[in-house]
Amino acid sequence: MRLLILFLFFLNCFSFFSQDEDIRHLHIHFKVTNAFGELTNLIIREIYEDGAIDTIYTEKANHSIDIDVNEHVLLEFICKGHVTKRVAFNTDVPDELKVLPFFDLVVELIEEDLLNSIENKEEMQTLMDFPMGYIKYSTSSRDWYNSQLEFTKTINKLIKKSFK
């Protein structure tokens, strides 16, 4: 009888700690930098389409998070003395895709002092209030499409242009 109870106890423990196969997520590894290097003491805010908000405080520039599939999430990268950067994620993926490719994200924040020193700072600030990137899964390339790189290049060109 003791053996049966012990067996049932272990069986229950294994089922309690095992992960449900239906739960899939996108693993995002990111590094947050500015013009001078990696940033520390960051706030990363996850804002979900249903209004749920999760806030992460991290001391290091490198961090990872997991977002469940079939979610639409806005990530905000916040650091004192820098303009907040927003990146939107659409984690809709085909059901037949069992192994999700992870995603590496490099986020470059702009210093508030730099933004305040340019001529068109109001226009730049308005532009920065919108998501600077949209990441979604591309079934044709079977990888994540990242428009954030093009937005960052455009912002950097506008900043350089204002100094000429």
Model-derived features: positions:
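Short, acidic Ser/Thr/Gly-rich low-complexity loop/linker segments typical of extracellular
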Residues: 50-62
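Short, ordered, surface-exposed loop/turn motifs in non-cytosolic proteins
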Residues: 26, 35-49, 132-134
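Extracellular beta-sheet/turn segments enriched in Thr/Pro/Gly and aliphatic residues
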Residues: 20, 92-132
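Conserved, compact domain cores that house catalytic/ligand-binding motifs in diverse enzymes
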Residues: 124-164
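Short Pro-Gly-centered beta-turn/loop motif in secreted/extracellular proteins
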Residues: 64-74, 80
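A short, solvent-exposed loop/turn motif at the edges and junctions
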Residues: 78-92
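Bacterial Sec-dependent N-terminal signal peptides
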Residues: 1-26
